[in-house]
Amino acid sequence: MSILEKITSSPSECAEHLTNKDSCLSKKIQKELTSFLEKKETLGCDSESCVITHPAVKAYAQQKGLDLSKELETRFKAPGPRNNTGLLTNFNIDETLQRWAIKYTKFFNCPFSMMDFERVHYKFNQVDMVKVYKGEELQYVEGKVVKRPCNTFGCVLNTDFSTGTGKHWVAIFVDMRGDCWSIEYFNSAGNSPPGPVIRWMERVKQQLLKIHHTVKTLAVTNIRHQRSQTECGPYSLFYIRARLDNVSYAHFISARITDEDMYKFRTHLFRIA
């Protein structure tokens, strides 16, 4: 079985919380744009996202007072390097996690962080995990800031400092489901967590031990999965997605997941920009 078969994502450009994948658009927008959608080839388009980002359609929508930006943000996957091995940006990552937070209503999506988060202002270092669990921590979902109880937490970090341009993406996942809670660090290159992450994990562990009897920290780093220079972003997102779909962290320490799997996963992550 392919590793991609263990998760619930698909190559559709529609956001994954939508149950009807025949169209990603709301019924109102479908009706208003029928003439464009039926003749999308004349616009040089082969997808709905292409149609609603076409200059002629955007101009028409503006005249009619239609909010196409909201459609793109809440009903489509994030734009990104879907069919190539382009490096993922923080926007690619955060916009994907925000969309997953619509599908997984108990998932707290934390904005990306650079590795100097202990001295630079990043949400990652300010989050109180007890407040996350109790629904007292603010997060961005469906275009608005909300509070809601969450039993999972995910964030993608870059191993570079904020003064740099970025080096390598890694993942943090906190699982507050079940009897034994876990604070997990995943690095597709197989490297151990650096000091700032170790300190963060221990601090969060002490927070959670105030409300739960068993909490452990895990470094999921015993296998070097990644061999390419481009797939650290997809690997980091894949780890979070697999854990949301209840794939055990043990799967990542028992067998290598290949770069070829991540090339395919890109088609599950993004719509064509």
From Swiss-Prot:
- Phylogenetic classification of the source organism: Viruses, Varidnaviria, Bamfordvirae, Nucleocytoviricota, Pokkesviricetes
Give the Gene3D superfamilies listed for this entry.
Adenoviral Proteinase, Chain A
Q: Identify the stretch annotated as signal peptide in this record.
A: none
Q: What induces it?
A: Expressed in the late phase of the viral replicative cycle.
Q: Which GO terms describe its cellular component?
A: host cell cytoplasm; virion component
* UniProt xrefs under InterPro entries: Papain-like_cys_pep_sf, Peptidase_C48_C, VPRT
Q: What is this protein called?
A: Cysteine protease S273R
One BP term from GO: proteolysis
Main location (coarse class): host cell
Q: State the family it belongs to.
A: Belongs to the peptidase C63 family.
Q: Kindly list the GO molecular function terms attached to this UniProt entry.
A: cysteine-type endopeptidase activity
Compartmental location: Host cytoplasm; Virion
E.C. numbers: 3.4.22.-
Q: Which residues form the active site?
A: 168, 187, 232 (nucleophile)
For this UniProt record, the keywords arranged alphabetically read as follows:
Host cytoplasm, Host-virus interaction, Hydrolase, Inhibition of host innate immune response by virus, Late protein, Protease, Thiol protease, Viral immunoevasion, Virion
Q: Give the originating organism.
A: African swine fever virus (strain Badajoz 1971 Vero-adapted)
**What role does it play?**
Cysteine protease that plays several role during infection including processing of the structural polyprotein or inhibition of the host immune response. Catalyzes the maturation of the pp220 and pp62 polyprotein precursors into core-shell proteins. Plays a role in the disruption of host pyroptosis via specific cleavage of gasdermin D/GSDMD. In addition, strongly decreases the host cGAS-STING signaling by targeting IKBKE via its enzymatic activity. Also impairs host FOXJ1-mediated antiviral effect via degradation of FOXJ1. Cleaves host G3BP1 inducing loss of stress granules formation.
- Protein origin, superkingdom: Viruses
Detail which positions bind substrate.
226
